[in-house]
């Protein structure tokens, strides 16, 4: 059953400080749009985020794509933009290893993800040890609240993340009610009857395109929100060839917000 409560109502009783902040931010900015910024240079990365910042609740990064990455030159300006435009940061790292390894990948190395990313995500293939390792890493390296999304379903054609895999991933998510805040999925993942309020973030959302040559499949904003999505993740639809990021940012924000209002019965 799809959750029809408002973001404010959900924020008021959610056990996670990350989820509380995200819901409050979404309500205050009237947006459920996450911008996925996959570009190879820091200059383009920061420029796009600055343009899209007013329209988004979250920016999703693949930080290892950036060829000229440096903590001082890439991450510190990103943090400043997040303060300027009031959005949160989600590093789409898709951790998939044993607990100690993911802890080190999360906290150490070049990227030091736990120090700057509010939210990250993980596959369920290694069981709940991965969740425990990431939680321990967050606790040891930052006083800021951190949240984890589990990858329950993917938007790519031929994905193996469905059926029993999805069900097992949901069980892993139940192991930590505060740290695991939700899923990357295509629909509501349930859990309401057991007291879970998982945030559903959905990639592969498009107002114009149906797919690409590399197996991506797109669904409409209204379609995904009506089946339980809380946050729509949009990438090339915002800044692809011939698109104006500010025009598209406003367009997707309005589409996502109106779909949310319809779901909650606030808009006919």
From Swiss-Prot:
Matches recorded under InterPro entries: Aldolase_TIM, OMPdecase, OMPdecase_AS, OMPdeCOase_dom, RibuloseP-bd_barrel
Enzyme Commission number, as recorded: 4.1.1.23
Pathway, per record: Pyrimidine metabolism; UMP biosynthesis via de novo pathway; UMP from orotate: step 2/2
Active site residues of this protein: 94
Residues binding substrate, per UniProt: 38, 60-62, 92-101, 218, 236
Keywords associated with the record: Decarboxylase, Lyase, Pyrimidine biosynthesis
GO terms, molecular function: orotidine-5'-phosphate decarboxylase activity
GO cellular component, one term: cytosol
Enzyme kind, highest EC tier: lyase
Catalytic activity annotation: orotidine 5'-phosphate + H(+) = UMP + CO2
SUPFAM superfamilies with a match to the protein in the record: Ribulose-phoshate binding barrel
GO biological process, one term: 'de novo' UMP biosynthetic process
Transmembrane segments: none
Family in the record: Belongs to the OMP decarboxylase family.
UniProt cross-references to PANTHER family, sorted A to Z: OROTIDINE 5'-PHOSPHATE DECARBOXYLASE
NCBIfam families attached to this UniProt entry: pyrF
Name the record gives this protein: Orotidine 5'-phosphate decarboxylase
Species of provenance: Candida tropicalis (Yeast)
Gene: URA3
